[in-house]
């Protein structure tokens, strides 16, 4: 299993939620507000002063091939949108 993490600007939150909900290989996901920090981000003046940029994080657990397929589709549907992602191995998951 893999954990696909997507970082999006707040302006894309609703559009990305709608898109993720229409994907047949995604049975659920988690989203949360996060703050990005660092010099590698384009920040406006207020963000530069506060040292953070608001963003939305999406986390999706998928089989590797499904995750790779979702990434291809994201690149096609959201080209140039400044989404950032990473794919990490997930050693264990479940419910308690």
Task: State each model region's role.
Residues 1-96:
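Positively charged, small/polar-rich N-terminal and surface patches that mediate targeting and assembly
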